[in-house]
Curated annotation (Swiss-Prot):
The keyword ATP-binding does not apply. This is Cytochrome b559 subunit alpha. SUPFAM superfamilies: Cytochrome b559 subunits. It is a single-pass membrane protein. InterPro entries: PSII_cyt_b559_asu (IPR006217), PSII_cyt_b559_asu_sf (IPR037025), PSII_cyt_b559_CS (IPR006216), PSII_cyt_b559_N (IPR013081), PSII_cytb559_asu_lum (IPR013082). It comes from the Eukaryota. The chain crosses the membrane at residues 21-35. Belongs to the PsbE/PsbF family. Pfam families: Cytochrom_B559, Cytochrom_B559a. It is found in: Plastid, Chloroplast thylakoid membrane. Disulfide bonds: none annotated. With its partner (PsbF) binds heme. PSII binds additional chlorophylls, carotenoids and specific lipids. GO terms for molecular function: electron transfer activity; heme binding; iron ion binding.
Length: 83
């Protein structure tokens, strides 16, 4: 049998009151913080994603789909000019 490292076992940790006091606060807090991050629209600003009403503008109603293999750079430039 191998030697002990002196650390507490996992079963000992998850059955302790201290573990559940700490995690009963932090887990719901992380969930609420994530929900607020997404619901307020801050996630769109931080990651630069377009909001749902900004995907298609009045001038650009089609999907920016690259169809040519050899002229893909020109198509990308055309799509970027339409923004």
């Amino acid at each position: 049998m191998s030697g002990s490292t002196g650390e507490r076992s996992f079963a000992d940790i998850i059955t302790s009151i201290r573990y559940w006091v700490i995690h009963s606060i932090t887990i719901p807090s992380l969930f609420i913080a994530g929900w607020l991050f997404v619901s307020t629209g801050l996630a769109y600003d931080v990651f630069g994603s377009p909001r749902p009403n900004e995907y298609f503008t009045e001038s650009r109603q089609g999907i920016p789909l690259i169809t040519g293999r050899f002229d893909s750079l020109e198509q990308l430039n055309e799509f970027s000019r339409s923004f």
